[in-house]
Amino acid sequence: MSQGDLPAIHGSEWRASAPLSFTQPLLADAARTEVLRFIAQRHDGHLFLVANVWDVLIENEPAQFEGESWHTFTTRFIEAVHRGLQAQIQAKMGQDEGVEVIPRRTMDVFLDRRAQHFLVDLRLTFRRLAHYMAVGIGQRLEWQRTMTRTRKLDAHLKTIYADGMATPDGGSFGGKGFRSTWQEGVVAVATALRRQPDASRDAVPGKGYDGDLVAPMIRDIGLGLAMGDTPLDVMAANLGKAGSNQNGGWDGAGGRDLHVGAWHVGVLPPTAPLPIASVTMTGLAFAAWRQNLDRFHVACIGEGTSSSGEFWEAMNLAGARGLPICYILQNNQIALDTPPAKQSGVEVWADKAVAMGFPAWTIDGSDPAAWHASAAVAREFAMEGGGPTLIHVETMRGCGHAHHHDDLYLGNASGTPPGYVDRDLLAYWEAKDPIPTHRQLLLDLGVDEIALKNMEEEEQLLVDKALKTVTEMPWPDPETVTKGVTTLNDAETHKQRFDRLKTPYEGSEAPAPLAVGETTLDYVESGGWTYARAIQQAMADIATRHGDQCVFIGEDMEVAGAFGMNMALKNAGHADKLVDMPLCEAVIVHTGTGAALSGMRPMVEIQFGGFAALGYNALINNAAMLRWRWGADCPMTIRIPLGAKTRSGPFHANMIESWFANDPGMVVIAPGCPQDAYDLLMEAAELNDPVIMLEHIGLYGLGGGLTGWGQNINQKVDTSPVQTAIDEGKRHKIGKAAVIRGGRDITLVTWGSMIHIAKQAADVLSSEDIEVEIIDLRTLLPFDAQTCIESVSRTGRLVILQEGQWNGGLGHTLQSRILESSFYSLEAAPVVIGAIDTPVPFSPPLEDFTVPSLDHVIEVVRFSAQS
């Protein structure tokens, strides 16, 4: 691709492959109305052209169409419209065709591209009408059944909320839920998809489940049910009972999240930061695109959440890459308490797709067949290379945001509160309630009233049975909540923490791993690898090991990557695994998360530490929680270059390890030397957890092979031990701290760039007969407390050295945990050394002043050792 290329118009070559079989004729007048309705919505400037072409061509057509005749007619119609567009341009533009509309884009090129988008929209409109007319009575009966199930389930959930269920502490709890009132038509989306409702409970996409994937909104219970979720699972999740599938992958450990979902049948559980589901589904679509999977993706979102930046980032990526996904944007007339007119200035919500370069249209949400036909054409288009689409659904939420919100929104029968809902709007949509209106349509189509009543009774029995079962279902054992934070660790209980305080620690008896003055941190003058080279080689070896499962995504990846870190991948023949992403960290991380859920092993790069703030929601509220919430593997590595002594100033050099200390679920590593950089990155790529690798730019060796401190830290890296451990399914270094210098008088705990300052300080102090034992944590979260405790119990003193700012730094958390088990071994007050509490400055003298210097470290350690 050339730098000056224009964006691809995905779907411009798409054509409906074959006629569909209509279940009833399509009246020509009705078809004309539907087509002109769409043109008025999306391309009003072409309204008269389309109407005129229709009126000319229809003269030789019958009054109604069957599938074959409709297919033939629409093909001729689009060709005629195209000719009409060309004729208009030739007649009106003349010599102006070559004029630049914008720099490097002439009038003829500009208008031709506009025409291509218009013709794609026309083809989709005609095909959508064909899918609508192909709907059969069997599909309609399924929709009616699932809508009925949804409404009856919602009624039970509201009753449970109001009445509550007895909890073990003698209280009452009714859970929380989001009803679907008047939005049940979404169930019809599922009949347009490839489903596998009988997949085993342990299935995941690609392993036992091979259907399409959906990301419902929090109130799209019906879509989940239509895919294969059950009323019992929905109730258990909304109540937080032990049998909920929000169990971290542990039987009987449910209740961790109130949101529903059924990943084993392709239903992605939503999250409270609502755009997360749609962006994650975009990541899953990205994985399908990369892996050439025959899989379609549906992401539902409300008009309120469509204001979020992450939703725009998702659409932007999908449009740029032509991903196989459909976004369903439901305007239900209120986002909690904020009306649509205060959310956006778009004329219709479908306009939001225009800026992203892909098709969109609007439907009436009270018509299940419109949902089905739209999803069907979106799937057909995407699966044949057309790319993404957006379906704007006009509907209304006939209830409060959640059960507790009904009175505020609709009003209480007592009149207090009175409710603020627009009564005219409410009456309009109540008259369009899809369940009774579609039921009447079924009767008009000849379905027997008794058959419908029998179905409704069956659905009532089904949800009644689920209610009985969930009532008898136990509440989760409280201690199960600690299970499965990461594959490396569970959480401690309060009792375990207290027992630790009560139990004297005998760690002073633990033998020292190194003799006093002995070190494992060796450098070489020649023949060694820089820190950067070790990381580069690890990436190349990971790509070789995992093949097409591996993908490297981030900003500016395909040319060389930041600091040229991707050149080794290209030189090793892995250029095809490098993917440039739009400049938005959130969608980069969410995409990696989706790819990981699809079975890939993505390696994500955030270019600088400060930029990670833009991806924080994606890291903390999405990737970090997946295992603990519902037991999902998320084998994703996130590389974040950062650190001082690079003269890169604020935003780039931030040390951010403390950001993640209070949000469990991620493994955080911070290698300080080439050998550990290679080993830890290799191991990170094997974990089924999100792993953040904080790699210090100042250690890369960009200054002629020297660090930002002017040191040579090059090492001869032995790649065999970690590869052997991986092959044998064993842990090598990850999760384990290392004593890198034996000492006697004081323990110095550190990580990353500071291990080299620590070693220099120890060498100086050794000449003063002060022997410092240095511990390199290597893995920060979860950290190896035991190695630190054993050392402090031997030396009696503790200093923690961090490059990051002192206030709120990770060192204080580490210190607290170490001292709980070694306090009575102390002979002096523990100390944390950190940077001064300012952002990282740009100017060399300022930056050098803020970061802990060698002289300062020597001074503090000497004082502590002599105290």
Regions found by a protein language model. Name each.
Residues 218-223, 241, 301-307, 329-335, ...:
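Acidic, glycine-rich active-site loops and adjacent beta-strand->loop/helix elements
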Residues 2-192, 207, 396-573, 826-867:
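Conserved acidic/glycine
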Residues 421, 806, 815-831:
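Catalytic-face loop-and-helix region of soluble metabolic enzyme cores
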Residues 188, 265-333, 363-381, 558-633, ...:
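Thiamine diphosphate
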Residues 167-172, 256-271, 295-298, 356-359, ...:
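Glycine/charged-rich beta-loop-alpha catalytic/anionic-binding loops adjacent to active sites
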